[in-house]
Amino acid sequence: MGHRITTQNRGRGGPTYRAPSHRYKAALKHIGDGTKSISGSIIDIEHDPARNAPIALVQLEDGSKVYILVTEGIGIGETVAWGADVKVKNGNTLPLQSIPTGSYICNIESRPNDGGKFVRSTGVQAVVVDKIGDRIGVRMPSGKTKWFNARCRATVGIVAGGGRVEKPFVKAGNKSHKMRNTASNWPRVRGVAMNVIDHPFGGGGHQHPGRPKTIARGTSPGRTVGHVAARQTGRSRK
């Protein structure tokens, strides 16, 4: 009798496969609700295990401190602001209706006052391309144009940390430290390299699946490995 394979253990949601969110510093949401202007000064730039982009510690006018996403070109000592009537400059957060067409933006809200959901990874940016009534057209990093409510807020600028994917890890230890901060299962062992008790493709005198790799969508959890509900396998026919 076999036992649960790795995918089944991950699905259970135990601490081994759960993201270590107790190490994360902040959720990085926009400040306020957009009805009044708020400003603060950047006092430090830090690393957050939750993300690849750097974050900034900002001291607000009332003395409280918050973390924000850093955009390219801003540093310690600079002032950032939130509000509908603040200046359109790098690092400031405004409603989309207040940002001119052609501006680079990031950390865009999906709905007004949800804190920011889109375009938050290192080195990415979106562009305001169109305004029709209370809808704002934004060209996303994928190239697709997405329409937002005009009251949704966004930060002006490009997310800092661009070029990260061009730098190699060099050592397995570096990759290990990175993956340790996520819920990823790394390193990933091939099913054919496992014992027969650990995976449907395991065991045998040599490494081979030993059975068809295509599997139906509704198959029991321990058997849904390989090409699940595949439309086709092998080379595509033109």
UniProtKB/Swiss-Prot annotation:
Coiled coil location: none
Q: Which residues form the signal peptide?
A: none
GO MF entries: rRNA binding; structural constituent of ribosome
Which family is this protein grouped under?
Belongs to the universal ribosomal protein uL2 family.
Q: Where is this region: Disordered?
A: 201-238
Superkingdom of origin organism: Archaea
- Please name one Pfam family that this protein belongs to: Ribosomal_L2
Which PANTHER family does the UniProt entry name for this protein?
A: LARGE RIBOSOMAL SUBUNIT PROTEIN UL2, RIBOSOMAL PROTEIN L2
The record's subunit annotation is:
Part of the 50S ribosomal subunit. Forms a bridge to the 30S subunit in the 70S ribosome.
Keyword entries, A-Z: Ribonucleoprotein, Ribosomal protein, RNA-binding, rRNA-binding
Name the InterPro entries on file: NA-bd_OB-fold, Rib_uL2_dom2, Ribosomal_uL2, Ribosomal_uL2_arc_euk, Ribosomal_uL2_C, Ribosomal_uL2_dom3, Ribosomal_uL2_RNA-bd_dom, Translation_prot_SH3-like_sf
Identification of the protein by name = Large ribosomal subunit protein uL2
- Source organism of this protein record: Methanoregula boonei (strain DSM 21154 / JCM 14090 / 6A8)
This molecule's function is given as: One of the primary rRNA binding proteins. Required for association of the 30S and 50S subunits to form the 70S ribosome, for tRNA binding and peptide bond formation. It has been suggested to have peptidyltransferase activity; this is somewhat controversial. Makes several contacts with the 16S rRNA in the 70S ribosome.
Q: Name one GO biological process term.
A: cytoplasmic translation
Q: Which SUPFAM superfamilies match?
A: Nucleic acid-binding proteins, Translation proteins SH3-like domain
Q: Which gene encodes it?
A: rpl2
Q: Which GO terms describe its cellular component?
A: cytosolic large ribosomal subunit
